[in-house]
Amino acid sequence: MPIDLLTRRAALMSLGAFASVGLAGCNATPTAGVQPGATPPPGLRIGVVNIDNSPLVAYVGNPTAQWAQQALPGALAQAFGARMAPGDPGAVPLDIRLDTLYLGNGGPADPDRMRGVATLGGHSISVRADSTYIANPTDQALPEQALQGRVQALAVAFAYRLKRKLGA
């Protein structure tokens, strides 16, 4: 009898561990922040980030446009790191207008896409970002979190694409 009990306990513990690991992947991705004591490298310094998502609201509606607006500042902080200087009076403001966001059907044949225009120091830069989505079994159970994760991945791709275009 103790052998059967141990086997049941082991089965229940492994099932519980498997369920918790599966649900842990559904947590929202933490946004990156700028370290307060970080000294910016010489050159480009970005001050205030203004995001205009009104064209995106008209294109895809809420909550998708709101997710993009919320995810982009953290993605920019992750991509630009110490070049973000929100309190620096000499830093240049970055204005971003998000125009379109398309969530594809998945895979490399139909990637997710985000397009917008970034204005930095009076110069406008057209930015296009792509992100490949691979379906996950938990996406069917938690579709809203899956869509939000895809928008966050697009925001990160957008930020790094902007960084590449700026040469920073």
What would you call each of these model-derived segments?
Residues 2-25:
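N-terminal secretory signal peptides and thylakoid transit peptides that target proteins
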Residues 22-43:
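Bacterial Sec signal peptide processing site at the extreme N-terminus
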Residues 27-29, 54-56, 89-91, 109, ...:
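Intrinsically disordered, low-complexity proline-rich regions
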Residues 38, 156, 168:
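Surface-exposed interaction regions that form or flank ligand-binding interfaces
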Residues 40-97:
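N-terminal segment of the mature soluble domain
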Residues 57-62, 66, 124-165:
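Short secondary-structure boundary motifs at beta->alpha junctions and helix caps
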Residues 77, 81, 85, 103, ...:
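Sec-exported extracytoplasmic/periplasmic mature domains
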Residues 82-126, 132-145:
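Surface-exposed short loop/turn segments
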